[in-house]
Amino acid sequence: MKLNKWLTSTKFIVSLYIGVIILLIFFLYKIVVYENFEDTIVVSNLDSSAGFYSMFFFTLNHYIYCKRNKIGFRIKSDNWLFKSSIGWTDYFEPVELTFHNNPTNEQSALHSTVLGDYPIRDYQMVIKNLYKYNANTKNEILNAYSKLNLVKGNYDSIFIRRGDKLGKESVIIPEENYMDALLEKNPRCKTIYLQTDDYTCYLNLVKYIKQNNLGVVIHTLCDENSVGVVVHGFQKDILNDASINNDANKDYLSSIIQKLNDTKPVEDMNSVEKYKHTMDMIVGIDLVIHSNICITDYQSNVSRFIKLAHDHPKNVYNIDDLNNDIDYDKIICPSYSF
């Protein structure tokens, strides 16, 4: 009996000792790789594993880390899901940090790799350092403002993301809830831009506005045939299951599931289709972040990006909690949540 206790105790101590050694090696590895080498450059890899703004938040993390520690930084987007021709510079200006001449030690940082733990406000402060439109993107954005006759700050906005998010990440919120919340925050609202991937949201809001004589004009750039974006093909299996078993979303999903099944995933689009899809998204998001007041939810990376990138972040409201702002001092990568 005593022997068994001794063996158990010894095994526990040995396991604990090994665990400490592994953690120490990992910690020292990070120090050696990223902090002690003046010739190191961190390469933030944009790949095909996740959505646009999920990857963007992790790239922001890599950028913050490099900027603080004076380490070289650049973006690699050869295999990026949203690459049309070149990659990042299809839509944005190139981004690079250089602190030392001719760095030779490249260290790759992938999606979901967190190099340092930072508060949300740190991410907010550097968004504009990376999110810099190239000339073509600027022109597309100007054309959109002209087409819709919108002036920055003189209209309100609503953002609703559906599509593949309804499989398991998001819960359907009735469109009228967003409208009511917006009118609560701005009773004088007369013009709204709706950014959504599901045209049904637009139709339902138009109907609600007419039925209640709200006297509000609503615009959208959403394709009238779209019932939601599907990023990866495997998400269709999740959506089909949710259309039967997801109590919160199944009623709506079951009514559009065939259209979702017919929707081409972003990963299967050709270069022309990817460019249009991505440019339309960037343009629409720009219209939102330069609105007066925005009502959204924080269930998606896009909406969390909108909160942080908006001209007046305090004017971006979470439909689930209109009276409380986020904690900007919370240490978390926004790709996970607020």
Go through each PLM region and give its residues.
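Leloir-type glycosyltransferase catalytic cores
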Residues: 321-338
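PAPS-dependent sulfotransferase catalytic core
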Residues: 43, 62, 66, 71-101, ...
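Donor-binding and catalytic core of enzymes assembling or modifying cell-surface/extracellular glycoconjugates
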Residues: 191-319
